[in-house]
Amino acid sequence: MLSGKKVLITGASSGIGKAISQALLAEGAHVIGLCRSIENLSEGVTPLACDLTVPAEIESAFASLASLDALDVLINNAGIAYLSPITTGDPAQWDRMWKVNVNALGLCSQHALKLFPKSGGHILNISSLSGHRVPPTGGFYAATKFAVRAITDALRAELKLAKSSTRVSSISPGFVDTPLLDQYFEGREDQLSKTRAEVNMLTTKDIAATALHIINSPAGVEINDVQMRSTDQSV
């Protein structure tokens, strides 16, 4: 079903984004990777360099896609995470998380809608269980993921009002063993080691398989949100 489909993935150079891009390539999709580190993209992915903290670069990147007949799927995967408490956190980290996790997701969605075919496209947002419950000391990261959840629901409602056939979905994973997790626990490596010892974490391939299931859902079916955790992650 994905053969020949044009799929744009943000943050496709590592972690979940890279795993999804590889799974899509195996299905015959035309994958476009929008990220800063294009040298780390998987072979076969069309590179599209962009700093997602800069709105003008996002606009320019999507303008360069105007030559495509249409874009079929947008996967908003890019994200950053800092364990930055409200009481003592660094406002510069808050600002960066908000720019990438929230603003860029909204802007990419806005631009992608203009490239979707009249029959509708599909937007898949990679969120987090932190968008459903707030972990201790991770309040501001959770705030960005609650915002992603709100944007996902709001966009779906807007498109229904507009009688659009575009589908909007999200995946909210628990712990996934990626470089993002190392970034999140920076300075608290002992805590991360303890978590890794106690929890059999999800893999990037787990998320990729779920993403393909959502994108391949039958016409007329919209999977709204999939919450995922390993069987031994309690919360």
Language-model-detected regions and their locations in the chain:
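Substrate-binding pocket helix/loop in short-chain dehydrogenase/reductase
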Residues: P85-I86, D90-R96
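Active-site helix of classical SDR
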Residues: S109, T144
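Conserved glycine-rich cofactor-binding loop
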Residues: S13-S14
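Conserved glycine-rich Rossmann-like NAD(P)H-binding loop of the short-chain dehydrogenase/reductase
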Residues: E27-L41
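The beta1-alpha1 cofactor-binding region of Rossmann-like NAD(H)/NADP(H)-dependent oxidoreductases
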Residues: C50-S60, P91
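Residue(s) in the substrate-gating loop at a strand-loop-helix junction
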Residues: S128
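C-terminal helical subdomain
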Residues: T166, S170-I171, D190-V235
